[in-house]
Amino acid sequence: MTPSPATTEIGNRVRWVIILALLYCACLVTLGPTVQFSQWYIGPDNNQAAAEAEAWLDGRLTLPGRGGDTALYNGQVYNIFPPLLTVICFVYYGATSWLNDGMPLVFFTPLYVLIVAAPIPLLAYYAFRRSGADTHWAAVLAFYAIAGTCLWPVAGMLGGNAAMVGDNRAAWIYSIQHILAQTGLAIILIDLLGRRRMWLAGLGLLIATWSRQTCFLYCLPILWIAWNQPQRRRALILAAIPVAITIALPGGLNWAKFGNPLETGYRHIFDVDNPNRRIVLGADGDVHLFGLGHVPGHAKEMFLVPPQVFTTHQGLRITGWGPRTALWYGSPLFLFTLIDARRWWRDSVRRVLMLATIPVIFVGLMWHGPIEGSSGYYRYTLDYSLIWMAAITPWTTGPTRRWIVLACLAWSVFYFYSISGNP
């Protein structure tokens, strides 16, 4: 007897729920002991964005004091990071203050984890479904994107590893930025590889850019794809509106703080009393945050430098020779972006997405160094790793390739588990 369409639909939904539940369980079981979500804590005392949210509630932009990377400009202290986390904290603190005046401005940990980290498995799963993976394989690739990349140790900086590097890392804003950006990048992929509503890709761009500024370069494939839609004018309008909003809020904040919409204030971290000022000082005595001279060294670290493998009384251990290690060693799956280059090049959407990662990578390579928080990995690879995985997804599903991908996954999980104790 052939089941009715309604019965088949119910069965598919039940299977989908079970697969997602297993994906979340796998992430919790694998990452939980080192990431320790229950220890995630954020408040104005340990995070610049949370302190700025408190300042917004008081009707000001200035912070009460310097903590972490903050800008000292005209005798005032400002947050210099993109605004997404500030907006999230501002909404939460405003709501809790309205409901219970006098309540401490501390994010309720389960809700904090739910907003920052919980969307990633679901959205990554949908991104790989749109990329061409079947129901089960999309869950495998989503697990790889979380446990088989440096997203694992980066998230660990907020929980288990925080105690190893000082309490100031318990809400290390750089880690939170990378994690939030994954949500935005996944939404971009879901839309551009799916129905191409364009406004949804624009929303993903906003989330990613308000977390990591370099992700704004993904507006290029969004606008290019909108230009090539059958209803070009409508698609461009739907894409341009969120792109404009993405620019407007950070630009307005920059203008209000520093008098220039293009001035993020990062250079003002390095005032004369900052011991790291020498890192960014040029021959002219001025602060230079970007430079072509940084490219060779950073490129070597991102793509060539091997990890250090050694044994202790606890067994095999892996770490970096220096602060960074090339992405191929921890995530060998990315080698397929080179092996399958001709294949993804023939797909116009995948091609333009992959091409957009080139300026994203290059801007990161031009950034001054050293790159903190990257022992055994290079955290800037998170700005494009999800794009690369989506680009090669259709060619990971063959009988031979599946076993190769599973072997890569096993190695990657072992690798990032091994370095998870290294801040």
Predicted regions and their residues:
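Membrane-proximal envelope and lipid/glycan-remodeling enzymes
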Residues: 1-423
